[in-house]
């Protein structure tokens, strides 16, 4: 289990999609993606970022709603982060190409498939 992740940016905003649309959330944009779509609106997240300890990431969470985005957040081992975010509602924005079954054990996690 990894205790650090490659993070592109962490910021607060209004969630624009999914079941928490319109609510404030902390967005954690993780680095990396298994696809290289020509229309990607966050291609800068493919390689740009820095490794951060899980505790440092969690310390920057400002709201009960958290969105993990990318790139493709499932390209990294995010289990330790999800464990640390229990008590939050976590939306994972995924491109839909990776297996989500390993994450079904988390009651506080849900998914939005977004291919842009």
Which residue stretches match the model-derived regions?
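Short secondary-structure boundary/capping segments within folded domains
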Residues: 16-20, 32
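Conserved Radical SAM active-site core
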Residues: 5-11, 24-31, 35-108
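Non-cysteine beta-strand/loop elements that form the S-adenosyl-L-methionine
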Residues: 109-116
């Amino acid at each position: 289990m990894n205790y650090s992740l490659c993070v592109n940016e962490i910021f607060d905003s209004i969630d624009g999609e999914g079941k928490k649309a319109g609510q404030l959330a902390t967005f954690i944009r993780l680095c990396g993606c298994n696809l290289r779509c020509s229309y990607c609106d966050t291609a800068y997240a493919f390689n740009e970022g820095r490794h951060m300890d899980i505790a440092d990431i969690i310390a920057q969470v400002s709201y009960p709603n958290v969105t993990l985005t990318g790139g493709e957040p499932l390209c990294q081992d995010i289990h330790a982060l999800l464990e640390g975010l229990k008590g939050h509602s976590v939306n994972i924005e995924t491109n839909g190409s990776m297996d989500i079954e390993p994450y079904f054990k988390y009651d506080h996690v849900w998914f939005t498939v977004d291919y842009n």
